[in-house]
């Protein structure tokens, strides 16, 4: 199993035995052993030219990938710079 940056190991410690895990073939995808879903769902979409496309619809609003990327980057900087959250800490955002 790939090493995790999470400092809280509760979820990993309570997984079922590895022989009970499903077999998932990811060989068709160009991802390394670790995946940052936030980057793939925001920054990568902007980099591929989809920045002006709608990413989210809800509460009567539409957000583009560029807007979503800007918001997540501001949120990440606030968590790290203002609240001193470190990589590996778990955060619940409501």
Placement of each model-derived feature along the sequence:
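A short N-terminal helical cap/helix-turn-helix that marks the beginning
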Residues: 2-13, 31-55, 70-74
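Conserved AMP-binding/adenylate-forming core of the ANL superfamily
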Residues: 39, 52-94
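Acyl-group handling in specialized metabolite and lipid biosynthesis
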Residues: 26-34, 57-62
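General secondary-structure edge motif
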Residues: 21-22, 48, 59
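Short, contiguous pre-domain boundary segments
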Residues: 18-27
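Hydrophobic alpha-helix position signal
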Residues: 26, 45, 79-80
């Amino acid at each position: 199993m790939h090493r995790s940056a999470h400092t809280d190991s509760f979820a990993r410690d309570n997984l079922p035995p590895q022989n009970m895990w499903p077999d998932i073939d990811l060989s068709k995808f160009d991802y390394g052993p670790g995946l940052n879903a936030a980057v793939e769902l925001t920054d990568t979409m902007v980099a591929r030219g989809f920045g002006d496309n709608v990413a989210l619809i809800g509460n009567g609003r539409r957000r583009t990938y560029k807007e979503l990327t800007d918001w997540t980057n501001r949120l990440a900087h606030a968590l790290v710079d203002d609240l001193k959250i470190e990589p590996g800490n778990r955060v619940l955002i409501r």
